[in-house]
């Protein structure tokens, strides 16, 4: 799965789909899209805010980009969580483990370990063949079932 296909899949086909599995490529391509877009919005908001700060206030343009950034984050909360749950499913793990790790990440020092656990889970390949969460997203027969 390439960049465009991953973004299209997450935003159009599986926006709030918590069932099934997400391959590593789907996950990492979408995360790249998310990080690049968030960085671009933040960078432009920072630039417009920096130049308006010289005049003693925040410009309307900086405010617009801050609002766009906020809306972007709110709009992608659900697909990001569903993508993470489906990535856990690909490892044959319940999505509830993600909730447990998010809660643990709020505890000082434990949060670092919980974040590393999520990172390692996302880096490891999914289980081969079908598992209790669905068919293998990397196998052609699995794709044929999904797009049939």
What residue ranges belong to the model's regions?
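Hydrophobic alpha-helical transmembrane segments in multi-pass membrane proteins
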Residues: 26-53, 61-84, 94-123
């Amino acid at each position: 799965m390439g960049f465009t296909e991953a973004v299209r899949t997450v935003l159009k086909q599986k926006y709030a789909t918590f069932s099934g599995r997400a391959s590593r490529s789907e996950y990492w391509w979408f995360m790249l899209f998310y990080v690049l877009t968030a960085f671009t919005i933040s960078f432009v908001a920072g630039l417009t805010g920096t130049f308006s700060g010289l005049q003693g206030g925040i410009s309307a343009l900086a405010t617009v980009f801050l609002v766009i950034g906020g809306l972007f984050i709110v709009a992608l909360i659900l697909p990001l969580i569903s993508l993470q749950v489906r990535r856990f499913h690909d490892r044959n793990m319940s999505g509830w483990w993600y909730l447990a790790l998010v809660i643990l990440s709020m505890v000082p020092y434990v949060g670092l370990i919980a974040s590393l656990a999520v990172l390692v889970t996302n880096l490891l390949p999914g289980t081969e063949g079908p598992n209790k969460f669905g068919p293998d997203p990397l196998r052609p027969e699995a794709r044929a079932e999904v797009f049939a």
